[in-house]
Amino acid sequence: MSRMSGVNRLPVEKYSCPNCETGLDDDQVRHSWRCPECNDYVHVWAHDPDTDTKITLIRKRGDEIEEGDLIHLPGQLTKDCYWVLGTSQVKDKVGIGLKGYGQFKVLPDEPVNCRIGGG
């Protein structure tokens, strides 16, 4: 099993590629979170009926996180997201500097939920 398939999720999720304008299913995207046709990031529309949280995400590897991304910490998809101020190599991990939080460390191939919009 790919580490990317172990990402935190919300109960209702729909997947699409903005470039190919194609709906995708979980089996097509869960191991890379990229479109199988064009390799662009898959957009994830996610909904939590219990909290009525509706968000749009992309899922990146830890080593793909960039300054300016908005990320959700593990288990916090229904809570605040944090602005990425920068990244650095910290031994075998990626250190992600987050505004209002401090540094959060992930493995290079660890999945990170990046918010790109509301629901």
Which stretches of residues belong to each language-model region?
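Intrinsic-disorder/low-complexity coil detector
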Residues: C35, L73, L107-E110
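Long, charge-rich boundary regions
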Residues: W45-F104
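A broadly conserved detector of short glycine/acidic/proline-rich loop/turn motifs that flank catalytic sites
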Residues: P18, L77, E110
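N-terminal cysteine/histidine-rich coordination modules
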Residues: M1-T56
